[in-house]
């Protein structure tokens, strides 16, 4: 993921979003559902109904950036709320994009090379 400025806030848009939406449609969702300005520099994260697709909308000061990710297996961990927003740290966003449960991260065993 692209490095975010230190003061950037990350917002999960709770519930599910129509993943057919692009830049303008997702910006409109951020405005209507969260009463937020999508051009303020915050990051807005949206999830589809099935839970295997995420879209991330971010205004970097020059234009809107849209990142999409689809998991080949499993679903992204998402808040139970049907509406509103949940704040994340940039580190939690990285975990979310990696498919890790950002609510309760668990250290996993990393195998070492066999000699």
Where do the language-model regions lie?
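Polybasic/polar functional segments that serve as interface/processing modules
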Residues: 1-115
